[in-house]
Amino acid sequence: MASRQQTRIQAYLEKNKIGPLFEELMTKLITETPDQPIPFLIDHLQSKQGNQGQLQRALSGSAALWAESESSEPKGTRRDFRSYDKPWQMNAKKPKKSKSDLAVSNISPPSPDSKSLPRSVDHLKWNWRTKPQSRDFDELNHILQESKKLGKALENLSRSIAISDELDKETLAFNSSLLRPRVIGEWIGRAENDADPLAAEMLQPPVPRSKNDSWESEDSSSSPAGSLKMEPKTKGLKQQQQQHKKLLAAMLSQDSFESIHSPTPSVIEEDIDNEDDAMELLENLDDLRMEGVTTLVLSGSKFNQGRPTHPAEPQAKVTLNICSRLQGDNLMERTEDTLQILHTPDEIIPDSLDSLPGTEETLMEEGEDFEKTSNLTEPGEASSGAHSLKSYMEEDESLKQLQVVHQPWLLPSDTESEGIEAEQDKRSADLLCVPCSSCPTLIYSGLSVKPAKEVASGP
């Protein structure tokens, strides 16, 4: 019985479209939200009564509602409930709610005292100048700023704590005896009203204390065994200029010739090193001794700025005599030139005897000049000339054989490389010499009159 009545009700509802009608009424109430819902529904039903012919369409669900709502409303207020946006329309409508949402709204109807918003609110245009209602980005920015402030506050707090700790440590260290300022030596012989005390201290070094002092014996193991010799920065410009002039005068006073041949370095270099601190590269033994260091290592004492004292190795060189017109007729000037020539260790003969015109005559003239100058030389130099003559006589036979073949030949030297270098020096010297009528040819050091005559008389 109940099932028959239920089927009859279901058929009635489906026949008269009661379900879609109520769905349409609910959607109109939800979308329009009028102040007086009952008169609004009555007006809507009266408008539906005049168009009953369209309700007979074979449409189902929400499609019938859309068709009925479009036909019932005037064209000015036509509304579309499709769920996608239409950017080409200025007033995009809200998407249509599903049936589940409508069922929920049927269960909990709106309260009668709820007021509906004016319809102009629904048709407001979007304005890009107005701020959005959502504050998400502003809140995020605010959170970031607050975190930065907190980070800065924490950093300042930690810095202040660290500074306070350092101040505490400094006060403890100042009160302690370990980091107490100390004076290593006593200054002797300096006036109290000295204008430049630092310069006086540099000139008069301190006298080292004895090792039985209590505070020095405690820290002698931990103190560094080196000292830096610092030039006072308060020196004026005039003092620096005077010191520079002294340094230049000391450098010019050194004899360069003697510094090359002498085995011992000059004494002035130590004064230069003491005056100029830029030359001081390694430890100063006086400073170490003044600090109380007993075991001094001489290997790292001080860098010597002097020239190297290597033994003078013989080098094959060719010297050119100056023209007699430029040199003058004074015989003493010529003897000085020949004495300087005699200092050169090795000698070289030109490449070929035939390459120079009048070689025999020029060699005879050189022999005569050597006879004149050898009378003015000292006995030590004469003995050195005799020694070179003896060494030359031993090699005379081989030289004569080379002269016959007219090959370029060299006088004996220590190594072949020295002969090659001497030959190159000779050729460059020949290019520099300007021959004239009164200019003597090459003078070879170490030769006297007899070997010159023998070379001239050779084949």
UniProtKB/Swiss-Prot annotation:
Disulfide bonds: none
One Pfam entry name: DUF5586
Region annotated Disordered, chain positions: 66-119, 204-246, 364-385
InterPro entries: DUF5586 (IPR040687)
Compositional bias per record (Basic and acidic residues), positions renumbered to this chain: 72-85
Name of the protein in its database record: Uncharacterized protein C8orf34 homolog
Phylogenetic lineage: Eukaryota, Metazoa, Chordata, Craniata, Vertebrata
